[in-house]
Each structure stands twice: as C-alpha cells, then as structure tokens.
Amino acid sequence: MKKIYKNVVIGKNAKIGEYVIIGEPPRGYKDGELITTLGDNCVVRSHTVIYAGNKIGNNFQTGHGVNIREFNEIGDDVSVGTHSIIEHHIKIADKVRIHSNVFIPEYSYLKKGCWIGPHVTLTNVLHPLCKKAKECVKGATIGENTKVGANVTILPDITIGKNCLVGAGSLVTKNLLDDNYVYAGVPAKKIKHIRDLTCPYDLIKIPYEIEEVD
C-alpha cells in the first residue's frame, strides 16, 4: 500500500515501494495545491515520505524510511540513504550521495558530486530557541566533490571548499575555504593536501585525484 497525492508527476520506469507517501501537503496547503515532480528511473524505497512542492531529477534513489520535506530542489543522480532527513528549502545538486541517518536542515546547499557519510549532522541555528532564531536560519554549503566522513557535525552558516575531505568525527566550527585539503579534529583544522593522502594497503598510489567539476 502506498499513497500518491494529487498533482504528483513521476517520470518513466519508476519503482515506488510499499508504504511510500509522495506529495504530502505541508502545513497550510491542501492536497494538490503544490506540484511535486520526480524524474525518470527513480527508486523510492518503502516507508519513505516525500512532501509536496519538491522538484527531483532523474535517477533519484532513496533507502528505506527517508523523510524529505517541502520546497527542495534535487538534481539528477542523487541518492539519500535509509532514515535520513532532508528538511525544506534545500538545494542538492547533481550526483550528490547522502548516506544513512543523515540530517540536512533547511537552507543548506550541497554542491555537485559531494558525499555525505553516515550519521552526519548539519545545523542551521546558532542559538536554538533564541527569540530571533527564525530570522537567522542559515544552513551550510558543502563544496563540489567534497567528502564528509561519518559522524561529522557542521555548525550553521559554514562553507566548505571543493574536493575536500572532512575526517570522521570532526566538529566544523568555522569555514574551511581552501580547496583540495583534508580537515579533521574537534574543532576541524587543516591537516594536509588531498594529494598527500596515501593508501595504507598499497592498493592505489593516490586515493583522490583533483577532480574538476563540469
């Protein structure tokens, strides 16, 4: 059993799992008032909820139990892992991969090709429950092809450059603007250039090349 609300457009060759809800009206909107689009070849696995007002590209995939709120722009070839939460008014570019149990708050921007590891938490309010908190909601911006390791926490209004690697368990408290670097620690600091990484198993000389973004 699944529920597809009014004004939902789903492309060709879609696979929609059991107990999926697509087009859930956000508070203050009626069924079908907002258009919701998913491109071709999407795979939406069981118990996922996609609210109305989303624009989602081709080859989109979810794990199980994903929650995607309203008014997001999601590009082509994006995947969102099991039990991850995507809040509203978020921009996710092409070829972004979001692992399981990730939290992405409103007004975040994930640029093309970035990878977000499991249990990563982005935040968007510096002082929760402050009387003015709603006036300064600012999500993080993750640069093109940047990899964010497991259990990283990123504070509000942070920008991370492109082709970076943020080490597992890091706490990002300030902008990491230099492209092509490894950052790690609590708080996260610059460790080395991405080309200086080596494989401990001698399987490859350089784990990451300097990737160019189309």
PLM regions with names:
Residues K2-A184, K190:
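Structural signal for interior beta-strand "rungs" in well-ordered beta-sheet cores
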Residues V186-C199:
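C-terminal end-helix/capping segment
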Residues P200, I204-D214:
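ABC ATPase nucleotide-binding domains
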